């Protein structure tokens, strides 16, 4: 039996580009649509506009400041999105 490695493991990669319309096929935002904002090739992840929203709580640095809550889109693995043909 042949051992599977990255070199002999074959799968079809999607050709995603910035600005493509995609649909989420897995996760909390399933069946939602959005456009690709950024692609992280080293991790095989994409950032989709308006999808996978996360919050980051920031403590005040000085005594006269107030804390903040930043909202941002977290990356999604490319296997969880499907390109929509227009």
From Swiss-Prot:
It is found in: Plastid, Chloroplast. SUPFAM superfamilies: Translation proteins SH3-like domain. GO terms for molecular function: rRNA binding; structural constituent of ribosome. Gene3D superfamilies: 2.30.30.30. GO terms for biological process: translation. The keyword Ribonucleoprotein applies. GO terms for cellular component: chloroplast; ribonucleoprotein complex; ribosome. The keyword Transmembrane does not apply. Keywords: Chloroplast, Plastid, Ribonucleoprotein, Ribosomal protein, RNA-binding, rRNA-binding. InterPro entries: KOW, Rib_uL2_dom2, Ribosomal_uL24, Ribosomal_uL24_CS, Ribosomal_uL24_KOW, Translation_prot_SH3-like_sf. One of two assembly initiator proteins, it binds directly to the 5'-end of the 23S rRNA, where it nucleates assembly of the 50S subunit. PANTHER family: MITOCHONDRIAL RIBOSOMAL PROTEIN L24 (PTHR12903). Belongs to the universal ribosomal protein uL24 family. HAMAP family: Ribosomal_uL24_B (MF_01326_B). Part of the 50S ribosomal subunit. This is Large ribosomal subunit protein uL24c. It comes from Heterosigma akashiwo (strain NIES-293 / 8280G21-1). The lineage of its organism: Eukaryota, Sar, Stramenopiles, Ochrophyta, Raphidophyceae. The gene is rpl24.
């Amino acid at each position: 039996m042949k051992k599977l490695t990255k070199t002999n493991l074959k799968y079809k990669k999607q050709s995603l580009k910035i600005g493509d319309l995609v649909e989420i096929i897995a996760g909390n935002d399933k069946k939602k649509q959005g456009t690709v904002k950024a692609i992280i090739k080293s991790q095989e992840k994409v950032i989709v506009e308006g999808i996978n929203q996360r919050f980051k709580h920031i403590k005040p640095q000085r005594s006269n400041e107030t804390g903040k809550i930043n909202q941002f889109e977290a990356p999604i693995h490319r296997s969880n999105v499907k390109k929509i043909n227009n």
